[in-house]
Amino acid sequence: MLHQPGMGIGYQPTAAMNNLLDFSKSKQAGIPISMVTCYDYWSARIISETPVDAVLVGDSASMVMHGFSSTVYAEVEMMAYHTAAVHRGLGGKFLIADLPF
């Protein structure tokens, strides 16, 4: 397992989050979840070995990965491309994808 900086002493990952119902139950119970943003296969492979609960493929990919000045340049095809790459590397973690602006 990878080092988990900033999670503090006594950090306990939440139970497996596999779908929207699990996400909703955690929210209703006041259980905090951890989520990171990811845009590519290799980063997803690394995240797959951590206790992170959920992964977001955000429209910020247009800025971070493609160098645009705004998220308005993200298109459905771009989001589908990055979401597919992350999905292939992520394994069974809960994956959330933004639709473009």
Regions found by a protein language model. Name each.
Residues 43-44, 50-80, 99-101:
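Glycine-rich, proline-tolerant flexible connector loops at the mouths of alpha/beta enzymes
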Residues 36, 40, 47, 86:
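Conserved, mostly hydrophobic/aromatic
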Residues 48-49, 84-92:
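Acidic (Asp/Glu)-rich catalytic clusters
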Residues 11-21, 68-84:
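Active-site-adjacent beta->alpha loops and helix N-cap segments on the catalytic face
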Residues 2-37:
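N-terminal amphipathic alpha-helix/helix-capping segment at the start of soluble metabolic enzymes
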Residues 37-38, 97-101:
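A cross-domain feature marking catalytic cores of carbohydrate-active enzymes
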